[in-house]
Each structure stands twice: as C-alpha cells, then as structure tokens.
Amino acid sequence: MNKLNKVILAYSGGLDTSIIIPWLKENYNCEVIAVCGNVGQKDELDGLEEKAIKTGASKLYIEDLTKEFVEDYIFPTIQAGAIYEGKYLLGTSFARPLIGKRLVEIAKAEGADAICHGCTGKGNDQVRFELAVKAFDPDMKIIAPWRIWDIKSREDEIAYAEARNVPIKINHETNYSKDKNIWHLSHEGLDLEDPKNEPKYDEILELSNSLEKAPNEPTYITLTFEKGNAVALNGEKMDAVTLLDELNKIGGKNAIGITDMVENRLVGMKSRGVYETPGGTILYKAHKDLEELCLDKETSHYKEQISLKFADLVYNGLWFTPLREALSEFIKKTQETVTGEIKLKLYKGNIVNAGMTSPYSLYSEEYATFGEDAVYNQNDSAGFITLYGLPTVVKAKMYQSLKKGTK
C-alpha cells in the first residue's frame, strides 16, 4: 500500500476503530490522528484519549457535537415525522453526516492525506460517512479497512487486538455490535442475527428497563412545544440537550422506545437490531399528536408523504443534498403553528395522550359536538353529498345502461 503522511480516523474506542490504529500504521506507515465525535455517548468517552494514544494515535480530538446534533439534526427530523420502515427512529443515520462533516474540517486543518472509518462493507454507515466526506471534500482519499483487510469477523478482530495488546473491554460471549448517542443505543449481532431468537432484554438493555421491570404505576409528564420543537418539560424551560437527557431517563424507566426490528439496509440485505430510543419515542409521539390538533387536513396528509421520503434520504446517507434541504424548508413552514402543551401517560412501554391544548388548535368542539349546536346546519350535508358523489352516480348509471342495452 502507498505510504501516507497523515490519516484522520473516525474513532469511537470500540473494537473496530481500536484495531484500525495499528493496522493503519503497519500498512501505510503514517501518523494516525483519532477524532471522536461526541454526540452524547457520555460514559463511552471515559479514558478514550489514554486508550487512543496507547494504541498508537498521535493525538485524539474529542469534538463536542451534541448541541448541534440535537438542534440541527434530531429536532428537524422529529418535525419531519421521519421514521424508517415504520419503526426505526434513525438514531445512527443522522449522526453520521454530522461526524463526517467534522472529520473533513479537521482533516483540512491538519493537512491530512486521507480519512479512515471503521464501517463494515456490509453496512449503511460506510455510505453515510463517505457521502458526507464527498459533500465537503470530493477529492479526499477515503480508507475503509473492512473492504480491504484480511480480517473477516468480530472474532478475527478480537484475536488481532489481543496479538497487539490493544485494550478492549469486550469478550466473545457479549460481543454485540453497538452504537450509542444521546438519541439511541443500538444492538446487533450474536443471537440477534437469527430472527427466531427472542432478545435477551435483561442482558441487552442499558438505557431502559424491560417491560417486566418497569414501574407498576404510570408516570405523567407534560411537554411544551413552540413551532414544532419541545422547549419545556413539566413547565420547566430547558435547552434541547437537557430536555432530551431528562426524557431518556423518564422514558427508560418506563420501558419506552424498545424496538426489535428487521430492516432493509441500503446495501441490499436485511438486518436485525434492537434499538433503545426512550426520549426520542416520547418526542415523536408528543409532536405527532400535537400536529393532529394544529395542522389542516391537506398539509397533514401531504406531510405524511414527505415524512417517508425524508426518512429514506436520512437513512440512505443523503443528508447533505438539495432535496433534503428543500424538504426541510417545507417542513419548517408547516411547523409555524405546532405550538402547545401535551400531557402524556407513560406505562410499561406505552405512551398515552392524556390531553393537549394549543392556541392554534383547529379542533372546534362547537362544530364537532354530538350534542345540540348553533353553528353547523346538518342539512347542508345533503348538497355536499350530491356533488361529492356525482362521479359515483354517473358511473353507476352507465353500468345500468349497459345492462339494459340502451347505451
């Protein structure tokens, strides 16, 4: 392999990126600068610098991207109502473009020759990282070890690490592939690869209680939204990061947001994962219910179509594209009236709407009541039905004529 002077490595401290440091030095005879994008993984950052240096990196950047992640990536996606294949709240998908953008910025500042990532050649993340890099530096060399090295499995990785004294905290029995940020925690691999196996929730879950261990009494919370963004919890104003942290704690306690899913990957195969998204699931439910109160029918129905496309774009690594940006502008316009307060009941994995109000509510009890009212003339419906049903009547009469042989 050609010698490189300096390589920027997207570094998490996990198994993949830990062994990539010595592999890069052995194969490219280069300086390795590790970059960790802090998107809210918290305790996973402990001891990371010491580990990176000990493994062979010349330095480690720990970039605090959490605020930008929540405000510029998570909240706009909530506003879009984007859910991939009806289940996945895109926890890994929208983190990768942000990290990729920052990798390019550091690579330029350091005068690096290449950017390296530890994504498997079977996964979606290789696409997400590399499209982000190409969006900001189309000429940057990208190294993807999983596509070129002789290591073929997680077991091979562990053996490689042990042979080079790379410090790792996992073992062969609990070697789930995980991804964690302030939004979610994903679990893949091992027994989860067989869809007939029930997940061992008591062993897997880290952010959440299992249903069985959730409290036997419900928890009530109140969320306040302004223009589609949650701004307060139980009447207390909070910044976006703090609010999401608090919802993660409350939701996790009540077993909210645990998803076992078989999804269609961008690269063609199906994969299975268990996702923990406690706070995010609460926000999606609250936001969607408030939209039901505040959006008119045509906007709401059209936005459902946009939500599906937006989810595909994010999942497929197309965050930095004209279409995603254009859709975000449309969505932003729809959120101008999504302001109000919603009370939620959380109980053993369930979220129940317990009442909501909005100054922009389009719900009129005066019109909708089953009781007596003075504003709606029910006789008006007759003319409406006559005109609305006219195509049906014309078609029915045409078939009647054909049957009679008179047409």
Curated annotation (Swiss-Prot):
Record keywords, A-Z: Amino-acid biosynthesis, Arginine biosynthesis, ATP-binding, Cytoplasm, Ligase, Nucleotide-binding
Keyword match Metal-binding: no
Localization: Cytoplasm
Binding residues annotated for L-aspartate, in chain numbering: 120, 124-125
GO molecular function terms attached to this record: argininosuccinate synthase activity; ATP binding
InterPro entries reported for this sequence: Arginosuc_syn_C, Arginosuc_syn_N, Arginosuc_synth, Arginosuc_synth_CS, Arginosuc_synth_type_1_subfam, AS_cat/multimer_dom_body, Rossmann-like_a/b/a_fold
Biological processes annotated in GO: argininosuccinate metabolic process; L-arginine biosynthetic process; urea cycle
Cysteine-cysteine disulfides: none
GO CC, alphabetical: cytoplasm
Subunit description: Homotetramer.
Cross-referenced HAMAP family: Arg_succ_synth_type1
Family statement: Belongs to the argininosuccinate synthase family. Type 1 subfamily.
Name by which UniProt lists this protein: Argininosuccinate synthase
